[in-house]
Amino acid sequence: MGVPRAREGRGAGSQSPPRGRCLHPFRWGSQDRGRGEGLALSPLLPGVPPPPAMGVPRDRGGRGAGSQSTPRGGCLLPPRLGSQQPAGEEGLVLSPRLAGDASPCCDGSPKSQGVKRGWLSVPTSRGVPPPPAIGVLIARGGRGAGSQSLPRGWSFTPLRWGS
């Protein structure tokens, strides 16, 4: 019963790096460059430069306020979606399309309890079409088993915060 654990107390599937190593993202699922299907992590090997992190913006030039250069002995971690930490990160915001001046239900009632922690719920402006959702695939056609359509009246809206 239970999950067998390694000697160091790490369970199966643990993604903690060994001491002195960093985890760097790389894509898999396709041999074509830039057409990966997911995100995996690989250890940083001594003397070998890390692969470029895909999708991580980097400033050109020095180590200014917006610089994403790797810290002195460490790793450049990929940004987290939906994080509440003020670190200039990007995320997706779940926003309802509301008619008139109605406001979303965010008072802890049953309608608002399905909202994930770290997501903001904001209404879109009336009369202004929402911007296209970046990186969200919506199934065309009916609501079959693989459909990723949102409930009627809701849309994904990209939002930047933190800087």
Swiss-Prot record:
Among the Pfam families in the record, one is DUF4575
Mark out the compositionally biased spans (Basic and acidic residues).
1-10
Q: Which InterPro entries match?
A: DUF4575 (IPR029363)
Q: Which domain of life is it from?
A: Eukaryota
Q: Where is this region: Disordered?
A: 1-163
Q: Write down what this protein is called.
A: Putative uncharacterized protein FLJ45355
